[in-house]
Swiss-Prot record:
Role description: Non-catalytic component of the exosome, which is a complex involved in RNA degradation. Increases the RNA binding and the efficiency of RNA degradation. Confers strong poly(A) specificity to the exosome.
Swiss-Prot/TrEMBL GO biological process terms: CUT catabolic process; exonucleolytic trimming to generate mature 3'-end of 5.8S rRNA from tricistronic rRNA transcript (SSU-rRNA, 5.8S rRNA, LSU-rRNA); poly(A)-dependent snoRNA 3'-end processing; RNA catabolic process; U4 snRNA 3'-end processing
Protein family (similarity comment): Belongs to the RRP4 family.
Protein name: Exosome complex component Rrp4
UniProt entry tagged with the keyword 4Fe-4S: no
Domain of life assignment: Archaea
The entry's keywords: Cytoplasm, Exosome, RNA-binding
KH domain ranges (all copies): 136-194
Subunit text: Component of the archaeal exosome complex. Forms a trimer of Rrp4 and/or Csl4 subunits. The trimer associates with a hexameric ring-like arrangement composed of 3 Rrp41-Rrp42 heterodimers.
InterPro entries per the UniProt record, alphabetical: Exosome_RNA_bind1/RRP40/RRP4 (IPR026699), KH_dom (IPR004087), KH_dom_type_1 (IPR004088), KH_dom_type_1_sf (IPR036612), NA-bd_OB-fold (IPR012340), Rrp4 (IPR023474), RRP4_N (IPR054371), RRP4_S1 (IPR048565)
Length: 260
């Protein structure tokens, strides 16, 4: 059964103590803040927005693309109305200004963490961990940031299934950028699955739906040789085994219905 679509101002509940993400309280009643999907649980009610831009928040993990190199900063496009600043002091070793283009140049992609966002929306970036995760291979697929929880799933259930069924490496940025790498036919299959998740994010039973889709598409691939459109090159990117922290999983679970 599909979930109920609500618009801003729709009454969600008359129990103000259950107000969750995407809602506001007025006169002890809960109303929808977004145009989105009603998400009802025993202890919380919320709304998953159907669309929206990425607004950076501290500790978000994102995929950034270099757009400007200055003597002390790399200015990053983070798929947001607000650019991010990755200061040279955040790099693992000391480098001179003249070396900055050699480390990261315009157009390069890298996995970063949002270090801080001030009241004026100045976004400071840092390395996700002690490693320097420049994305030298693979490709980046972009989905609406509000659909990211559906790509990851409860406790990473969806992304784990995608990795297993496509044999691809995947990293999902909270800004809607998804890095994928693998063999040509596997990458093509995964890209199709990601587009289907984005298009059907409001549907219930999505994980099972995507699993069946992948099985059917894999059968079609075996029947006819797929056209090659992607070259991954040599594997140069080594990501941590666990792509997302437990804190991120908890945030995701707040937004998703446990039956999906």
């Amino acid at each position: 059964m599909d979930k109920k679509i609500v618009i801003p101002g729709d009454l969600i509940s008359e129990n103000s103590k259950k107000a969750g993400y995407g809602t506001y309280v007025k006169n002890d009643k809960i109303y929808s803040l977004f145009c989105g999907i009603e998400n009802l649980k025993e202890d919380k009610v919320g709304v998953i927005p159907l669309a929206g831009v990425y607004i950076p928040s501290a500790n978000d993990v994102v995929i950034g693309i270099v757009i400007v190199v200055t003597p002390s900063n790399w200015i990053m496009d983070i798929a947001s109305p607000y650019d991010g600043l990755f200061h040279v002091s955040e790099y693992p070793r000391r480098i001179e200004s003249r070396e900055m283009h050699e480390v990261l140049n315009v157009g390069d992609s890298i996995i970063l963490r949002v270090k801080d966002v001030d009241n004026s929306m100045k976004v400071e970036l840092a390395l996700r961990d002690s490693s320097f995760h420049k994305l030298k291979t693979g490709q980046i697929v972009e989905v609406e940031p509000v659909k990211v929880p559906r790509v990851i799933g409860h406790g990473g259930s969806m992304i784990s299934m995608l990795k297993k069924e496509t044999n691809c490496s995947i990293f999902v940025g909270q800004n809607g950028r998804i890095w994928i790498d693998g063999k040509d036919d596997d990458v093509e299959l995964l890209s199709k699955a990601l587009r289907k998740i984005e298009a059907e994010a409001q549907r219930s039973g999505l994980t099972d739906r995507i699993y069946n889709f992948l099985k059917n598409e894999r059968s079609k691939q075996k029947e006819s040789k797929p056209a090659k459109f992607f070259k991954s090159g040599k594997k140069e990117v080594k990501l941590p085994k666990e792509d997302h922290s437990e804190e991120i999983y908890r945030k995701i679970d707040v937004l998703l219905d446990p039956n999906n």
